[in-house]
Amino acid sequence: MARLHDKVVLITGGESGIGLATARLFVSEGARVHLVGIDDAKLRAAVDELGEAHASSAVADVTDEDAVARAVAAGADRYGRFDVVVSNAGISGAVAPIVDYPSDVFARTLAVHVLGAFHVLKHTIPHVPDGGSVIITSSVTGLIGPPGVSAYVAAKHAQVGLMRTAAKELAPRRIRVNTIHPGPTSTPFQDDIEMRATHLPQEEAAKAFDAMIPLGRHSTPEEIAQGMLYLASDDSAMVTSHRLAIDGGMSG
């Protein structure tokens, strides 16, 4: 039987990158997915690809609590529950030393990652049945502290704290809460960060980052999605308050 047979999954940031790769894998494993994001055209394209029998979408900026509440309600009205929640929306912020970092960008980066994840959990948890799974996409930077990306690092560490509290609160209902920590992953999102960090063209920037990874290469979105599947499925029935790194050894 498919590992997510008849499961309903909400994924924020589901229109591209890791979120879309996760949606594809989950649908192939028997799930129905409700995708939430800010790009309506990409969301519609994702639903068309996955099939309307298997997917739906809603537009919301996760920093807007009312918008999140509406997006969650739309999915709950259609499916009745969310067996799995993947809080995956994110932005990269600036690349600059702390003394030069724009305060408004710092605040926005924390808002998307931390306040956004809080909004998603706050409004989805009432629709998660006992024994469900909540996954927050953190980052390898939620385990280490590279220079130049202070807002992103702070936000990704903060998500771990939110996860740990939620895991304790929801344990009596056997709802598991975990973070996943991708290392550099081959997506346009990562390409942009690397080019700004290195001031190199994309291919050269990627090689510079490959050199930081003990296993010598970027992960693919599909490899991160496999980690998502583990945390979403019954295979991880006794895994909660855990930080799952898929980073080629970068955080080791």
Language-model regions: role of each:
Residues 15-16:
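Conserved glycine-rich cofactor-binding loop
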Residues 40, 59-71, 103, 222:
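The beta1-alpha1 cofactor-binding region of Rossmann-like NAD(H)/NADP(H)-dependent oxidoreductases
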Residues 121, 155, 163:
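Active-site helix of classical SDR
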Residues 92-95, 217, 228-229, 236, ...:
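Short C-terminal tail/terminal secondary-structure segment
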Residues 171, 176, 239-241:
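Short, small/polar-rich loop/turn modules that mediate ligand/substrate recognition or access, typified
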Residues 139:
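Residue(s) in the substrate-gating loop at a strand-loop-helix junction
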Residues 96-98, 102-107, 209:
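Substrate-binding pocket helix/loop in short-chain dehydrogenase/reductase
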